[in-house]
């Protein structure tokens, strides 16, 4: 008897021939599964591995521990032996249970496009509904593309992260995008009432033995939506899906029976729900080189600047030419510029005689307090910073940003505001060491990059130098550099 071999996380077909290819799994796991005589040995091996995992899990930092389920990673019961749909490939297993990510995986950007996904859906004659998941914070009217342009199947548009919109419902959104409110809805996974409302809207569109495809850009919330539906219906999908804010986590189209979602899809008896890879959007992914041990810690937990100044901030060393990522979408890269202080954006950096790997810059990240959000309970949740090269549809005014500029004009600390370049989606700021006297400079160079309404990044260099800081520059917010206002780094 043969079994379908695919990863329960990313959906790729499991293989043990090429370690660098997707879906790789150690040969020992596959060879033991199909041998009846090795069932007892495999169970013992799983028990041993689970014991090791449990011991390691107990020693994790509580702040990191809450992001990972305390569950087994291999088939545990004898009746499940031989079911390879319960296995993880090496990549997904390392990401889910050990927070290990290989640099080459971080540098992958989504290559799939919306037409590519829809062409696969159109070839499935059993398709009854397409749910297009759109992050409402990334909606740009002139760039929005509906899946209805590529298919004759019904498309329901689900706009996620609606909790960041103004209190009044934006009735202008759907007409502005040219879609009917009958097939569109604002949604946030934090409300079960909206989950029930969503099910009430899509269930009439379903048919028995039909297929439902969930499509959307990378990190738009497709997997989170499916997990929320399973949780609402008392299903088991929450246990089977990989959860990560990294782009490209779902690497292949994968179907799940309606039983995984409990009582959610009543009209879809014996049908399938398909999770699809995130397609490439207008804003492309920004991916870093970052110590994976700090991958979770780099997401700030509070917007209160006062709390962060009295607590220990996140501190990280970055070599010149490397990047760090903030909240998943903002990249900041320090560069050393020539002695004459000139560097052309886009040109390669010519390092000095010193070994660049021996010179590091310290980065400290904190967030600013937002006075307008005192009653917002989401303030206590991790803040994912999202910045844009174009103004999102829900940001209609920059009055708050201008008033913030005016309020800082009389500050004792000199501030410099940098305007975005119309030719580039990034800009540069030059940080020079303080000159104490003629030919004598402060032994350290430090500064601060302020992101209005979002946060600030403090940095300190180990010797006098000029630094070039490159970052994505959104038109929705302004940036400025300043002298550091946070405590100095510990030597």
From Swiss-Prot:
The protein's name: Uncharacterized protein C2F7.09c
GO biological process: mitochondrial ribosome assembly
Top-level taxon of origin: Eukaryota
Any single GO CC term annotated in Swiss-Prot or TrEMBL for this entry: cytoplasm
Molecular-function annotations in GO: GTP binding
TM segment ranges: none
Protein's organism: Schizosaccharomyces pombe (strain 972 / ATCC 24843) (Fission yeast)
A Pfam family hit: MMR_HSR1
